[in-house]
């Protein structure tokens, strides 16, 4: 599906994130194709959006290269920074979050994955929209990260479960915990 979606608007497709899951899917086709351990998350935009990279922990290092550089892609440039004494690194595009074990919805994503994207592309207090809310994972992640949310779900069984999950998440936050 992501290939069709990406091809539908190549002029606005910018890049993809790859979610490496802890569980495979696609067992019914296992004799015809490899099991699927990843899902692609596509990023589209016309104008550069807010981007707050979620730094990854790595080994501390000091800068060892000269001050100026030349790149075939970017031309001449001046390096900035002096290394990473705390070991923090810019994120790569492969994210590892365990799959949800007990799901309400068949395509339910982990809250931590949604929190990652919400923190990457929004500021606290902003509104996050999910037009296919399913089990309300995005709403729970928005609450956990101090954002507001607008969600839509048209399937009555999922809507009921989603509203209960949001209620429980709000209660957890009031008790000083995170919603799940």
Where are these regions (language model features)?
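Core catalytic lobe of class I
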Residues: 1-161
């Amino acid at each position: 599906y992501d290939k069709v979606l990406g091809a539908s608007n190549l002029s606005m497709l910018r890049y993809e994130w790859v979610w490496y899951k802890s569980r495979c899917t696609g067992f019914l086709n296992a004799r015809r194709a490899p099991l699927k351990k990843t899902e692609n998350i596509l990023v589209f935009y016309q104008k550069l959006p807010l981007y707050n990279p979620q730094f990854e922990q790595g080994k501390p290092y000091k800068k060892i290269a000269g001050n100026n550089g030349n790149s075939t892609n970017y031309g001449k440039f001046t390096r900035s920074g002096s290394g990473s004494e705390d070991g923090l690194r810019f994120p790569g595009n492969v994210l590892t979050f365990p799959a949800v074990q007990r799901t309400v919805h068949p395509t339910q994503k982990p809250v931590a994955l949604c929190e990652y994207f919400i923190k990457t592309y929004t500021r606290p207090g902003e509104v996050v929209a999910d037009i296919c809310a399913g089990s309300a994972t995005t709403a729970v992640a928005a609450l956990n990260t101090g954002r507001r949310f607008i969600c839509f779900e048209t399937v009555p069984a999922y809507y009921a479960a989603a509203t209960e999950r949001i209620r429980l998440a709000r209660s957890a936050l009031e008790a000083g915990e995170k919603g799940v």
